[in-house]
Amino acid sequence: MKTISLITRSFAVAAAIAGSAALGAEESKRPNVVLILADDLGFTDISPFGGEIDTPSIARLAAQGLSFSNYHTAGSCAPARAMLLTGVDSHRNGVPNIPEALPPEQLEYDNYQGVLNDKVVTLASVLQSAGYHTYMTGKWHLGQTPELLPSQRGFDRTIAMGDTGADNWEQRAYLPIYEQANWYADGVEHTLPDDFYSSEYFIDKTIEFIDSNASDDQPFFAYIPFQAVHMPVQAPREYSDKYAGVYDDGWTAMREKRRLAAIEAGVVPENTAPVVTPGTLDWNSLTDEQRRHHARRMEVYAGMVDAMDSHIGRLLAYLESIDEYDNTIFVFTSDNGAEGSDIITQDGGSVLAPWFERVGYNADYETLGERGSWNAIGPSNATIAASPLTYYKFHASEGGLRVPLVMAGPGIDRRNEISDEFVFVTDLMPTILDLVDVENHGGSWEGREIEPLVGTNFASYLSQGQSPIHEPTEPIGYELGGNSALFKGDYKIVMNRTGQGDTEWSLYDIKSDPSEAYDLAEQKPDLLKAMTADYDDYVAANGVLPMPAGYNRVLRILGPALLQLRQDRP
């Protein structure tokens, strides 16, 4: 186990540390919990992990707590959220894939419905039963029928968006697979205000919910799953313009800058190799206009991350004002790696252009990111967000699964450190319950049997540094949409069947080689054989289904809508 002390990167962060009381101060009541989940945030998109984007609020938490550079989640949003909130593998909690991507052959199985089933209990439900106020504001995407909304899964007060994503400026769908953007408040349909901007609104409502009970002695759990930085990537111009010119040298140059900065920050080893994800365009082969548009798309992306961090800062300031900051556990992470879908063309066009025209979206350079625009960074820019890792969202490669994790607050006695201990998304629920001294449900809830937690409680590591969190002989399996991995000690096997067309397993030492530059399959055949056998056991134990021949995720999600658009053309 290796930990690295974070060197304070700016006077502002140093001043924030000096001016704030220690986060671990003892209180007469249980600690509050604030769980902040970014959407499609890449590994080096925050400043503590080597990113150039200004994130002082997250940096403040990192400086006052412990960050994990070897934390892994799922490669797509709903399975990650389901495992985060239940501590149960996605094939057992009902969400092995997003419902929009599930093929018909798999929908015949109860554990392949794409919504939380009744065999799991959420972190919110357990905390609610222990006397916590429970609040959620943001993206849900775990079921939209009344019994599946967050108001029925343990949350007292909610503002929830039910789809894969939505516009950040107004209440409208962002893809033609939806008739409308589906929003709910406390379990009923909700209309957004005219001055809506997602990150601002979520923090406004979180503060409102907390403030409504601030005078009592009950602790609170606030779950804030931002839309940032899921497409459509949108941000107020004042945030995007801060990054004018930053990305003008292109993704190859910026990817290398981030790799070196990540090494300096201590989030990857010094010998981490540079990699080029297959399919990345040659920046120098593009026209000036194409480069200009790609750079602006990334400026808006940076602005959206910056805006999210700014609103997180408002929440931190509010908690200080009511004397709850020092008694609050903060957890910040992302649901999966950066989004690499190629919705927008190099010149600002789109495969969705007919639908854009119908509903009033545009991808114009001059207004990119503002109200009425539709923006995505695309696969080549996504390699910046994932740098120095390989690939991005949906893939089982490190760029899809490895994201930042920052924890601070009572019970997290280690300050200003980065740990390279392996942590998996299902580990967070049992750890949070231990930190607030609430009993694990143990596989039984309200007189019925439910799925037990499968994650490892690492609360003692947060205070005492006891390692390893996972024994080197413990296999941890993963599968989503045919893309598979298994972790064991420092090693990982991976096969991206539907992402890259892999037909053979690759083997990597991801502690020393996080960029997956050196395939060890031929050098360590016995280890590969043992780990593939472990994966087969995982498949059998968790009911993992094979993907049907010819499965294509994009066509499954968008195909019918694109076909309808063609048929509707005059």
Q: What residue ranges belong to the model's regions?
A:
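Active-site segment of extracytoplasmic enzymes that catalyze sulfate/phosphate-ester chemistry
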Residues: F43-Y135, R153, R157, D163, ...
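C-terminal cap/loop subdomain of S1 sulfatases and analogous C-terminal strand-loop tails that border
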Residues: D156-R157, M161-D167, E370-L401, I412-I510
